[in-house]
Amino acid sequence: KKSKSSFKPKIVPQNTNTEFLDGANKAYEMIVQAYQSNNIENVKDLLTPEALNAMVQAKAPKEIKFSEVKNSSILEDREEDSRLIKSVKFETEHYNVANNEILTVVEDWGFEKEKNTSDPNWKLFSIKLVS
């Protein structure tokens, strides 16, 4: 049963979180690869209009290439007004082709989705570089 009160914590079955993280990892890879190849419009359905605009204006460094997601975990899972929000910590590896180094990058990505929508996709709305 769904609680109508926004004050009660929502208990999410573990398999739902696993499924969400699998999708979030795929979205991360798709978004980063599209960004690095200056084709961010190809993944616009995975971004809020604000996130899309920010990524269109920013240019990815040519010497840094995405390698893999090493680890991901849900940091936050909340409801806010008519939205569901999940914050995911990504630990990833990128390759610096200029100096032949592997870089470890830690970022927190915020995904959102309208509560009462038939669209199963979550949209990226924020990125915070941790390290």
Describe the role of every protein-language-model region.
Residues 3-65:
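Core segments of small alpha/beta cavity-forming domains
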Residues 18-21, 79, 98-99:
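Short, solvent-exposed beta-strand/turn "edge" segments of beta-rich domains on protein surfaces
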Residues 21, 46-47, 52, 75, ...:
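Generic detector of leucine side chains in alpha-helical contexts
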Residues 23, 31, 38, 69, ...:
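Generic signature of intrinsically disordered, low-complexity segments enriched in small/polar residues
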Residues 42-45, 58, 72, 110, ...:
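Intracellular C-terminal tails of type I single-pass membrane proteins
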Residues 46, 51-55, 64-69, 87-91, ...:
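A short linear-motif detector with a strong N-terminal bias
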Residues 60-79:
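A short, amphipathic edge element
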Residues 81-131:
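Exposed beta-sheet edge and beta->alpha loop/turn motif
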